[in-house]
Amino acid sequence: MSQQKKYIFQVEEGKEGSDGRPSVGPVYRSIFAKDGFPDPIEGMDSCWDVFRMSVEKYPNNPMLGRREIVDGKPGKYVWQTYQEVYDIVMKLGNSLRSVGVKDEAKCGIYGANSPEWIISMEACNAHGLYCVPLYDTLGADAVEFIISHSEVSIVFVEEKKISELFKTCPNSTEYMKTVVSFGGVSREQKEEAETFGLVIYAWDEFLKLGEGKQYDLPIKKKSDICTIMYTSGTTGDPKGVMISNESIVTLIAGVIRLLKSANEALTVKDVYLSYLPLAHIFDRVIEECFIQHGAAIGFWRGDVKLLIEDLAELKPTIFCAVPRVLDRVYSGLQKKLSDGGFLKKFIFDSAFSYKFGYMKKGQSHVEASPLFDKLVFSKVKQGLGGNVRIILSGAAPLASHVESFLRVVACCHVLQGYGLTESCAGTFVSLPDELGMLGTVGPPVPNVDIRLESVPEMEYDALASTARGEICIRGKTLFSGYYKREDLTKEVLIDGWLHTGDVGEWQPDGSMKIIDRKKNIFKLSQGEYVAVENIENIYGEVQAVDSVWVYGNSFESFLIAIANPNQHILERWAAENGVSGDYDALCQNEKAKEFILGELVKMAKEKKMKGFEIIKAIHLDPVPFDMERDLLTPTFKKKRPQLLKYYQSVIDEMYKTINAKFASRG
């Protein structure tokens, strides 16, 4: 039998715990950094250099594109070249200086992804300003907090977000003095701005302010902060993560090394669809990598229902997604299959089993079944535009059944990554054609050191033969601290190691499996500790539910859950079992609840979960957990305190009912 490949090597020994600190496992590094970490490209000391050097090298390459609207209908993508974008950026920078914006001022950007978003960001980069994205999904309270906390003096804003921005007034106007619309400004908006002591400009009007003026660009250092990204914590106020130029240029060097080592290097011919929020580090660094390669970035129209149409028109080569988007793709394909009749499904399932079988034997997705790719799976590829060669999933765990399905049917590499805003995104990423990495986030990228730290209270041992513990990261991609919160910085950054709060398990091939969250642990009344995230990940593999929140507390002896069922599977079950009613009615139906609970219990037993980890009651909510009700963060992480508050009466009723049943049994 051939020896298993290992994608990491050890650089330091592990250490036993001492002085109240837990033990730590060995320090590991990517095999692609065997001869040291890659140096950033010569002359590339800042984010501005990333763009400037590409303008010099690829002036006529298409850079930013958006769909042309002709007679109210979307047409082809229309492009601005690197040189054209540079010329606008220089004008915008001159305008910023002409209205008195000083070095290291904080500049807010508020709105959905667009060419203007990137142009505003590059103008900040040119003049050494701190770019502060204002979350499109956080609402007025958080936007007001970020403007005031980071002392934002000027905001670039999407036209339809102007009214939202004004809701932060007058509190935000202590610092915010100037507003620039990505589009036009109405007379009423000008008047409203005046009442708050603000000056508001339309995009073209603001650009004219810099005409005929020339300001010297300041020298940018690697250590300079280029952006403060506020992360939406699951509790408390957002934290301002300071990202330096060095973090981003180091990350780019690591991505170049990784993709070259995996024979998937980026080129000028690559095309990217920009739809994941630029206010998140995931999309920001991907776009920086594309800009560094002189590649093209096309923007979506801002509507998730039209995303597939935009994909078909743009034909991207790299498609980045969060699991929610890929879950939708998976559910849509499953529905098409079951609606297509027995024969169609039989052919598809046979083709799937055949190709997956050969991939399990070590063949690449290209070699496993070219015939079935052409006859059966090509339609899936066409649905993503026809040119996608890599799908990269990040921000949250991707369910294994979705990942394995897409690896077979999408005719491209499906990779899962892991990173935090604090680590400048990319920290781990799985590798092309390595089926053994299914369900993991892959090995480390070649610019960080990784070690696990034991978590004794959760019985995770970083020195055990199967090493488990809190993931800790060291390297130049790490953030420079939380803005104005040195206390919080000291909590997570200890001796150069970032403590992520995520619990991981090293796999034999050097990839990392995220198994738990350090803080998501509570005790049941009988004294048993429950690692809730781990349990939710297992229940999340049940195809009959799209999302599940598990709850317990120290006054009760058992767990309960709130779930969003998979509509298609629930309706199919109802039809097969003679249960009537629409989707909303089915979610209230006791038999439907028993069915979903039964599926979860079946999975729990299959995974040999402990008795106290098995859910005893369930409530079905037809409305998915969402940001509108403040139940999720913008990266789709569950806000547990808010979920508890929202579903408190339902939870109380479930416990009352089950406890009454227990009591009646005597």
Swiss-Prot record:
One Pfam family here: AMP-binding
One annotated GO biological process: fatty acid metabolic process
One Gene Ontology CC term in the entry: Golgi apparatus
UniProt keywords, alphabetically: ATP-binding, Fatty acid metabolism, Ligase, Lipid metabolism, Magnesium, Nucleotide-binding
Pathway per the UniProt entry: Lipid metabolism; fatty acid metabolism
Obligatory cofactor(s): Mg(2+)
Signal sequence, renumbered to the chain: none
The protein's Enzyme Commission number: 6.2.1.3
Residues passing through the membrane, by range: none
EC supergroup of this enzyme: ligase
UniProt-annotated binding residues for ATP: 228-239
Function: Activation of long-chain fatty acids for both synthesis of cellular lipids, and degradation via beta-oxidation. Preferentially uses palmitate, palmitoleate, oleate and linoleate.
PANTHER family for this protein: LONG CHAIN ACYL-COA SYNTHETASE 4, LONG-CHAIN-FATTY-ACID--COA LIGASE
Protein name, UniProt field: Long chain acyl-CoA synthetase 4
Lineage: Eukaryota, Viridiplantae, Streptophyta, Embryophyta, Tracheophyta
